[in-house]
Every structure is written in structure tokens, then in C-alpha cells.
Amino acid sequence: MAALLFYISAIFVPEAIWLLWSFPHWETMHVWNSLSEIPTAYVTAFISGDALLAVIGFWVAAKLIRSGRDYAAHIQWIAGYFAFFFVLAHGWDGTGWQRFTWDPTVTGMPWEPGRTMWVDFATSNVAITLYAMALPTIVPMIAGGYIWLRNGHILAGLDGARASSLAVKGVAIYLLGVFVAFLMAACATVISLHLTTQAGMLVGVIVTITVAYALAFRRGGILQTAISRGFNLT
């Protein structure tokens, strides 16, 4: 918990504040165009929510592991990434990907439905800032995850070499889980956008989760097997 709180307070939350301060339009998905427009309560909830959700996630995962439901604890973080990517890709009205790929500091124009920079966003001010933040965000998380997993396997009675091998596999499977969550979000978004009914978003999410469960998450599924072996679950 101490390591998590340090990571959140020293890296994650400061980065979120930086993005909100430098790109308030992009960080709020273009709901507001400047800091002066954003309600103070929203900023407070945004900053505290970043830390609170991480702590709640840690607490829930710990409760699941202590009750012997290790696999459910892993499903939780995959579900979190799915929700994260789905918000970016779909948003609340199907335009999330357009909002994400629009940087008013480059275009000089506020976002409107239908506007997107497409591949030009990759060289935008927002994108360059995200690239700069990637190293201090991802490296400590990957390195910390490896150390945490290795120490955990050693405490469970495994020798150092076996513990290190499983820790590497665990990190690789974590990255695989993130990628699967991204694919699920993309599929849910595509399905939702092809449905014209008001329930399109819900249908897209349900269909995606159902297919993902059948292919990957059920007992004996691809991801379930990988998680069980990679994290040495019994």
C-alpha cells in the first residue's frame, strides 16, 4: 500500500494535474475550454478521485485474494482498463475517439462533433506531453510489479530463479491483459457505433463481454489459463 500511495502521489496525480492545467479542453474531453470554466468541485473530485479509485482497487483486490478468489482479483484490473479505454474510445456519446484525437493548441479551434486530427494527433502538443510522461509512468509500474511479484513468490517458498521467471511472466501477462482490455473497448465501441438505438452502447458492451468471456475469461479460456500459469494461481 505504501508503494502504491507513493506512486500515486509522486507520479500519477501530478501528471493528471499537469495535463488538466496545460490542456483543460483535452483533459475534460472538450466539455470545458479553459481552467476558468471548470467548476472547483469538479477539479477537486477529479484529483481526489484518481487517488481514491486506486486505493479502492487495491483494497478490493486484497479482499478477493484473502478470500481465495485470486482470479477475480485479476479480472478487476482488466475490467478497470476496459472501462478506461472504453471511455476514451466511445465516451458518453460515441465521439470519445474524436475528442481524444483533437488538440486545440495545435488546430486553434475548439472541438466539434466530427472533428478529428487523425494521425496528425501523434505529433500534437498533447501527444508529445503524453510521450514524455510515459517513461516515468510505465517504468516504475513495470519494475515495481516485477519486484513485488518476485518477492511474493519467494515468500511463497519458491527459489530465486523460479520466482524471477514467474515475475517476468506475470509482467508479460499484465501487458497482455491491458492489450485485451484495449481490444475489448475497441470492439465495444465499433458495435455501439453501428447500432442506432439508444441502448446501442449497452448492447455493445454486453456483446463484447460475452464474446470475451467465451474466448478468454472462462475457466480454460486463453487469458484465464495464461493468468493462472503466469501468476502461479492454484
UniProtKB/Swiss-Prot annotation:
Localization per record: Cell membrane
Transmembrane segments: 5-23, 38-60, 73-92, 127-149, 170-192, 197-217
Source taxon at top rank: Archaea
Cystine crosslinks: none
Coiled coil: none
Cellular component annotations (GO), alphabetically ordered: plasma membrane
Keyword Transmembrane appears in the UniProt entry: yes
Keyword Membrane: yes
Entry keywords, A to Z: Cell membrane, Membrane, Transmembrane, Transmembrane helix
Membrane topology: Multi-pass membrane protein
Protein name: Uncharacterized protein AF_1499
Organism: Archaeoglobus fulgidus (strain ATCC 49558 / DSM 4304 / JCM 9628 / NBRC 100126 / VC-16)
Phylogenetic placement of the source organism: Archaea, Methanobacteriati, Methanobacteriota, Archaeoglobi, Archaeoglobales
